[in-house]
Amino acid sequence: QLNTEFAKSETRIIFWFDDKGEYEDEVSELQLGDVKLHILDGTNWLYSKYLLNEEDKESKYLVYAAFAKPSDAENPLADMYYYSTPYYTDRVSQMSQEIGIDNCFKEHLSQYANFWKNKHRIEKFKELGIDHYNAQTIDIGLIAVLTDVKTPNFEEVVKQMMLGDNEKYFKALDDNGLTDKFWELCEKFFGYKSYKPNIDDLSACMILTYASSTLKATVPEAMRTYILKKRNDVVVFIRNIMDNVNYQDAYDKLVERIDKSLRFVTRIQDGLKKDVEKKKDSSLQMSDIFACDAFAGLDDIIIDWALEQLNDEILDAQIDGLNIAQIADQRMSKAYHYSERYKNEYTTIKYAYLMMKSVSLMEFSSDIKTLVANYQKESYLIDSYYRWFYYAYDQIEDNSKFSDVRQRVENIYANTYLQKITPKWNENFTNEVMNATDLPKQEDFYKHYLRGYDGKQRVIVIISDAFRYECAKELFSRLELDEKCTPKMECMLSCLPSVTSVGMASLLPHNEMQVDGNLNVTVDGQACASMEQRDKILKSYNDNNVALSFDEVANANQARIRELIQGKNIVYIYHNQVDARGDKPASENEVFNACAEAIEEIHKLVKKLTGYVSAPKFFITADHGFLYKRDRLQEFDKVTYPKDKCLYTNKRFLITEDAVNEQGIMARTMAYLNKLYVDTPVGADIFKVAGGGQNYVHGGTSLQEMMVPVIELTKNTRGCLLYTSPSPRDA
């Protein structure tokens, strides 16, 4: 407007008296071309008259005064004012015109004159991009700017006030006359109204209203005044906060503060205790609590309830028709806000229940074939449940309230499950029966699984030390999800004793295997304890066979892997994670962590190799399994033995020249033992042997030690034949 006026030839001087001084900070920034700016400050009247009439009579001037135009009698420039051009404007009018707000809202905008004085705030208001202006959208926009919200959305404003620095924001609202408007909008959007509204009270009302949508009658009587009428709108609002990762930490702190102030969860707990005292059924309350995730303390109530059922072995306890494991699964689902926080607690509860339930339903058959079939089909899961229980239990920061359940799990696993199934297995496990199980023997592994690939397709064999059957089952379930390959799983019966030296030797190609009284093993007269010795034995059958360490392959890049495997026929890769940790007393209680790592490492290596080299066939197996119990046996529970008869002693087996015919001990001889005997406890006990760990053991004749897994993995692409001019593509 000013530039348009100055463009007129007759306009030389424009007087602008800014009554409220709204543009005092900005007038010097105006782009006026050749026009000069002169500021009247109330004391420079005479100089101003001299400047405009004498000193510079040619230039065009904008004369600005940040005060109202004085009367003619008090205005030394009155004569000049009347032959010059006056300019009138106010910030509200200017802003509404620039932004595109209809002039009918000028009076509404004028209420917030202080807001429009700040150029930065005006720019932020413009950036909101409000589509349609009315009194409400204007108010929300102003409040959004003052609360650092970048969208004209009142729900976002309330989130900011509930979760942010609301003291600073309320001061900004007060300074600009918008506090009352904020509370009016809270009533309109959420139904919140109070004689003394404050953000803590609003937050409490919002959270408790959300909680009431599922807690229903379980909401304590004293808390019901907090429930807002617009429940559906509040539920959607709170759920959006809970589901947004950017707000979750702030929400958790807010809810914790509200619960501490109102004792909301404590009141619910008190109500449940009274029901117990009155022998009143609390199933409806538990159903309500199970459906609600507003407060972390509600998960504690559910966890305490589940632990109580497990401690009392009430395994048919339910909430809403769900058993304890299903309840734990549901509370761990992402639909529940605190699922990640309580993941370890619920996982511990889930597998405690599944282990206890499975053992309670198990029938301990005396028939070897039935035992083997049942173990392969379902009873192996008891070992997995036990492992998964401890894996989660060990990760709970404070697991003290789980101690009774842990003890019950331990007793059921060790004294009910292992001490029943292991004697059943051993009592009927004669040499004749061993041959009648229809399972391949470990010493026949090469002949049974690999002989057909000699000189033909490449085969990769991964042998993981102590990778027991139930661990392999978990790996197998992962491999089943991979569309690039087809897995099949079987098992073999391990050699005895079920230890590394014997198991590793039995997996090599051989015609004859011999084990002496010191547990030294040879295959076809050759030692086979080291990687180099095993590589030599493999190459004696085929120059293109090779033995490699797992770490060497896992840490290699694609070029190095091709260098290691290109042109090879049968590739043995030796992995040692479980036994390396379990066999050391200092780390034996980390064995279940080692199992999880072993599963992950083998899976990653298979995926890596299937991408890097042509190998249509993989086999994943182990040298032996293991037994693990968390609690140590008392000395009087250990099995005594005749020391004078022993050539070799171990926690789980003895090597003797003559069979040990004592109660609780089983003696067996194998062809490769040179008429020596392997003597093992009938149960899952250990011999009274000094030294070493006793939680993690192997060498004996339990299903867990002897059922050696064999995963056969077929890559779903056409394989290549070797030896006929191998190419980089073949590698």
State the predicted function of each range.
Residues 723-731:
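Conserved small/polar residues in nucleotide/adenosyl-binding loops
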Residues 31-32, 77-84, 475-482, 586-592, ...:
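Short secondary-structure boundary/capping segments
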Residues 437-445, 449-493:
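Segments forming glycine/polar-rich beta-alpha architectures that bind adenosine-containing cofactors
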